[in-house]
């Protein structure tokens, strides 16, 4: 056992000593971050997660300690004892400890380090693959340590907040019954039940509802969830969410609790006061103005739906718009203020950008002094009446640029939504990453309960089948499911969905009608959800809840560029762990015990 560990105890971290500590004898533990040998004195910057402290080993004070310090190299793990001394005129303003240094009287090397594959510095140009391969070294870097400490603080604040409000932190199973549909599950074979599989829970949804039916009326959990999906910048196969459920509530009660949490986190972590209540926007308005249900409201540039205008003008001399309307598509425009000076090259780049999302092109018009359109193929055929109507609808002014999309509704929404954000970044309205100092929270409410699956010819739940429909829309469950809106809500921040939830169905008869609207037979419903249907018949209370994505929340709080920067041990976009080599092969004996056989044949 190291002498320093048994005989001495750490007195301070490497980031807390100040001039108030001058004259004190201290014991520090950490890693050698930097080393400078000036002959008669060796200087090191000693690092731990709290910061850096300069330590001096002087030959004329302790020759033996100075000699040992001569062996130090970067990333050696050491213990140091010494006296805190003023740095006089050599203050380092970049360090919290920059007014002092420690003159060492004792040193112990706990462990040596081989040369690291990259520098342990704030900014490095090492590729992500190398950093993930040596993640334990990457995590020694101050930016990642600050991020994970912020994450720990968010965990702590969240637990205290909900506990103070009378919530119980309760656990739910990870290994659950597999049910087809929804997200693709990770499967776990059961050795004791040959041929049977568990699924790793994609969320605690059903179990937290069952807690409500069991009488635990306020539940929360910071929980791991698993989804075997294609990965993106903001996805990981295993992720963490702040999961919440409450009995005897309507959606305003959920909003009140969750806004309180968010306001507390922003105040305690960033020192920022977030005003409440948060803005609310119907789903239909969000789609019309912004093309998606997670709009970034830090800047303006809303879309304008022109479908009715084009219909009223019978196409207005623009055949492609006319055809889109006749085919039950939509026509949208977006006014880009004072941007008529965009060059042809810039416009061409925008057109290539939208084509990459499935658009056939990018119609545009530059607005002149008299409202005329220039540098636009549309200007040749559009009627003056439709042009004037579009200018008025878009509130177009001379010098503005109008951009158009028309065609299939889903494509137009997606293209225009992404184009809006792309232009905002290009124009400097928002930064590429981070908040830019602006925080625009929004509840998107009242979405459709169902969406039509053209492939199967069936209505499917837009989120899940346990969401309560609006009472006024129950009449449409059998006749026109597309008209049924529901008590679902998403919490959006700066263009990211950070949480979503709903008021749940607690009436077994309405639940059965929802299943039938989705084409789910009584037998199928009982096979998949029999336990829940039985519980609904046993005095289930009105209840609702929400889940916030912890990883995404921390990503936004810290200004990180991706979720991989806020997860300690992330997977790559292929779902692999470059450090451990997971996923890996399993020996044949264990597969036989699990009654599993691989049919994969390498190409």
UniProtKB/Swiss-Prot annotation:
Keywords: Aminoacyl-tRNA synthetase, ATP-binding, Cytoplasm, Ligase, Nucleotide-binding, Protein biosynthesis
List of residues binding ATP: 227-229, 236, 497, 549-552
SUPFAM superfamilies reported in the protein's UniProt record: Class II aaRS and biotin synthetases, GAD domain-like, Nucleic acid-binding proteins
GO biological process: aspartyl-tRNA aminoacylation
Record organism: Anaeromyxobacter dehalogenans (strain 2CP-1 / ATCC BAA-258)
Cellular compartment(s): Cytoplasm
InterPro entries: Aa-tRNA-synt_II, aa-tRNA-synth_II, aa-tRNA-synth_II/BPL/LPL, Asp-tRNA-ligase_1, Asp-tRNA-ligase_1_N, Asp/Asn-tRNA-synth_IIb, AspRS_core, GAD-like_sf
PROSITE patterns assigned: AA_TRNA_LIGASE_II (PS50862)
Reactions catalysed, as given in the entry: tRNA(Asx) + L-aspartate + ATP = L-aspartyl-tRNA(Asx) + AMP + diphosphate
GO CC annotation terms, alphabetical: cytoplasm
Subunit details: Homodimer.
Enzyme Commission number, as recorded: 6.1.1.23
Region (Aspartate): 205-208
Chief localisation class: cytoplasm
Domain of life of the organism encoding this protein: Bacteria
Gene behind this protein: aspS
Binding site for L-aspartate: 227, 463, 504
Function: Aspartyl-tRNA synthetase with relaxed tRNA specificity since it is able to aspartylate not only its cognate tRNA(Asp) but also tRNA(Asn). Reaction proceeds in two steps: L-aspartate is first activated by ATP to form Asp-AMP and then transferred to the acceptor end of tRNA(Asp/Asn).
Family: Belongs to the class-II aminoacyl-tRNA synthetase family. Type 1 subfamily.
A Pfam family annotated for this UniProt entry: tRNA_anti-codon
Sites marked Important for tRNA non-discrimination: 38, 89
HAMAP family per UniProt: Asp_tRNA_synth_type1 (MF_00044)
A GO molecular-function descriptor: aspartate-tRNA(Asn) ligase activity
Protein name: Aspartate--tRNA(Asp/Asn) ligase
């Amino acid at each position: 056992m190291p002498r320093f560990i048994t005989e001495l105890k750490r007195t301070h971290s490497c980031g807390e000593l100040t001039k108030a500590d001058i004259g004190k004898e201290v014991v520090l533990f950490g890693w050698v971050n930097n080393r400078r040998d000036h002959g008669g004195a060796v200087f090191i910057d000693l690092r731990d997660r709290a910061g850096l402290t300069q330590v001096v080993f002087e030959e004329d004070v302790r020759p033996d300690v100075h000699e040992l310090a001569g062996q130090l190299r970067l990333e050696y793990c050491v213990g140091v004892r010494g006296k805190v001394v003023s740095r006089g005129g050599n203050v380092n303003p970049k360090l919290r400890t920059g007014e002092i240094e420690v003159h060492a009287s004792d040193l112990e090397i706990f462990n040596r380090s081989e040369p690291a594959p990259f520098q342990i510095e704030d900014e490095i140009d090492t590729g992500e693959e190398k950093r993930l391969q040596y993640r334990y070294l990457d995590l020694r870097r101050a930016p990642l340590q600050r991020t994970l400490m912020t994450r720990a603080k968010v965990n702590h604040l969240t637990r205290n907040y909900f506990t103070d409000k009378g919530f119980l932190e309760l656990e739910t199973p990870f290994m659950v019954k597999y049910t087809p549909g929804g997200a693709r599950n990770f499967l776990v074979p059961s050795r004791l039940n040959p041929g049977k599989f568990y699924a790793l829970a994609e969320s605690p949804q059903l179990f937290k509802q069952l807690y409500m039916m069991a009488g635990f009326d306020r539940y929360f959990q910071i929980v791991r969830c698993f989804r075997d999906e294609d990965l993106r910048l903001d996805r990981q196969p295993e992720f963490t969410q702040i999961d919440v459920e409450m009995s005897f509530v309507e959606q305003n009660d959920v909003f009140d609790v969750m806004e309180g949490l968010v306001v507390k986190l922003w105040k305690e972590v960033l020192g920022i006061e977030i005003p409440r209540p948060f803005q609310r926007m119907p789903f239909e308005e969000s789609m019309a103005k912004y093309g998606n249900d997670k709009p970034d409201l830090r800047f303006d540039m809303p879309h304008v739906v022109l479908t009715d205008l084009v219909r009223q003008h019978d196409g207005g001399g623009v055949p492609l718009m006319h055809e889109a309307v006749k085919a039950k598509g939509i026509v949208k425009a977006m006014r880009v203020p004072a941007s008529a000076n965009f060059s042809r090259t810039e416009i061409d780049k925008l057109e290539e950008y939208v084509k990459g999302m499935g658009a056939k092109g990018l119609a545009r018009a530059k607005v002149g002094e008299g409202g005329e359109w220039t540098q636009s193929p549309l200007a040749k055929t559009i009627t003056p009446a439709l042009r004037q109507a579009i200018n008025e609808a878009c509130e177009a002014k001379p010098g503005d640029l109008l951009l158009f999309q028309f065609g299939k509704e889903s494509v137009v929404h997606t293209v225009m939504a992404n184009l809006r954000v792309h232009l905002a970044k290009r124009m400097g309205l928002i930064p590429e990453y981070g908040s830019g100092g602006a925080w625009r929270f929004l509840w998107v409410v009242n979405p459709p309960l169902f969406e039509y699956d053209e492939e199967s010819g069936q209505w499917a739940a837009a989120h899940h089948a346990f969401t309560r429909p609006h009472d006024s829309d129950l009449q449409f469950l059998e006749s026109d499911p597309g008209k049924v809106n529901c008590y679902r809500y998403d919490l959006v921040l700066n263009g990211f969905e950070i949480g979503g939830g709903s008021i749940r169905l607690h009436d077994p008869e309405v639940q059965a009608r929802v299943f039938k609207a989705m084409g789910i037979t009584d037998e199928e419903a009982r096979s998949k959800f029999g336990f829940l249907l039985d519980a609904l018949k046993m005095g289930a209370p009105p209840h609702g809840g929400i889940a916030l994505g912890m990883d995404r929340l921390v990503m936004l709080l810290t200004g990180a560029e991706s979720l991989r920067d806020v997860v300690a041990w992330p997977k790559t976009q292929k779902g692999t762990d470059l450090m451990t080599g997971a996923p890996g092969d399993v020996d044949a004996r264990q597969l036989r015990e699990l009654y599993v056989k691989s049919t994969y044949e390498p190409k």
